[in-house]
Amino acid sequence: MQFKYIPNILSFPRIFLAPLFMVFMFKDIFIYRILSIIIFFIGSILDFLDGYIARKYNFMSDFGRYLDPIADKVLIISAFLTLNLFYPMLVKSWMILVIITRDIIVTLFRFLLMNNNVVMKTSKYAKAKTLVQIILIHIILVMHLYNLALFPVLEQSIYYIMLFCTIYTLLTGIHYIKINLNHLK
């Protein structure tokens, strides 16, 4: 095995963990709730590891540049869609629509740039966005484990964090387009 493919090998499981995460979430039994947290946590760690290894050892590839953002979006959007079904007053449908629309536009823009031999690097703002999304999802999953209704103060906070996350996600999309638009000329 060539070590340069390790980041890609770490990206693939995230795509397959997403439906598994969703299945366990819908099995509304305590052990399955724990498994859904573990699955999402593993996906989050794999996201960190593939990027870290790719950058540290310069194991970046064109295929990985396509695969990694798609794997990220599949895992995170699957989590938000599932959480929307459980907590529609916290993770609102319009918020998910904004996040999905932004992700589709940025991903298509990234692919367009790649077809023009331009690599759109992940900005520190987008990395922060992903971190906030992952932390928020983990918090909701832990609260789901113990029944969210037991945390009324946190429940209100979660809504505002989700709102912030949605707005910040939109702003990072605008930022990406703005700083990379000149590469299309």
Where are these regions (language model features)?
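Alpha-helical transmembrane bundles and membrane-interface segments of multipass inner-membrane proteins
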Residues: 1-185
